[in-house]
Amino acid sequence: MGKQTNISIEVALDENKIPEKIVWSAPDGGVNEQEAQALLMSLWDGKNQETLRMDLWVKDMPIDQMNVFFHQSLVTMSQTFLRATKDE
């Protein structure tokens, strides 16, 4: 196996286990303790042929920002799918 790297996500929770703060780092990508308000993560389990997901957002994220976040995420997913498969 070649070089390995780490991407880390730290989530601060309130007393009810609701996210209050999300911080992520990807040192090889030049990201160090960058704060974020939301994340949508999907991982493919090829053995079981299913998607594993983790969707998080901080409790004080405004709905208008959530709308923009989802719109941009869906557009990006569409572009990534087209680039990866050439399937329109």
Regions found by a protein language model. Give the residues of each.
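Structured beta-strand/loop patches that form or line metal/cofactor-binding pockets in enzymes
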Residues: 1-9
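Active-site- and interface-proximal helix/loop "cap" or "latch" segments in soluble metabolic
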Residues: 4, 20-86
